[in-house]
Regions:
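Hot-dog-fold acyl-thioester-processing enzymes
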Residues: 1-72
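HotDog/MaoC-like acyl-thioester-processing domains
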Residues: 1-3, 84-132
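Hydrophobic beta-strand-centered segment that forms part of the acyl-chain substrate-binding groove
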Residues: 40-43, 52-96, 105, 122
Length: 132
């Protein structure tokens, strides 16, 4: 199984909700316009962890995802390639790498509207039949 999800636009409201709730203090998130990062990036970058959150939601909302998935139980080998920015449209490319009686294993890639890789990781889902 391999699939590509819909795209989600990352908005300034999303950025403020995430950074305010988590109380980010690093200047790239708290004072971007006056930081050295504004010389490197034209737009406000998002915290990388937000992409993991978005990827989980995109995977879950995919209508052909296996119906016997109980829970996402592992994320590993996370590699951030480049930041996502406000107004980017991001989506998930997911590829099933292995299936066992208890688990599904996927490779996830989060990309932007320019098909640039933002994030790669491996995830493991527990199947319903194995929940206690």
């Amino acid at each position: 199984m391999k699939y590509t999800t819909k795209k989600i636009e990352l908005t300034n409201d999303h950025f403020l909700a995430v950074t305010n709730l988590a109380e980010y203090t690093h200047e790239i998130f708290s004072d971007f316009k006056n930081s050295n990062f504004s010389k490197k990036y034209k737009n406000q970058p998002f915290p990388g962890q937000y992409l993991l959150f978005i990827a989980g939601g995109l995977a879950e909302s995919y209508d052909k995802l296996f119906k016997d998935i109980y829970a996402l139980i592992e994320i590993k080998n996370v590699k951030f390639s480049k930041p996502a920015f406000i107004n980017d449209k991001v989506y998930l490319d997911a590829k099933l790498s292995r299936t066992t009686e208890k688990f599904y294993y996927f490779d996830w890639k989060v990309l932007n509207q320019n098909k640039e890789l933002l994030l790669f990781c491996k995830v493991k889902f527990l199947r319903y039949s194995q929940q206690s």
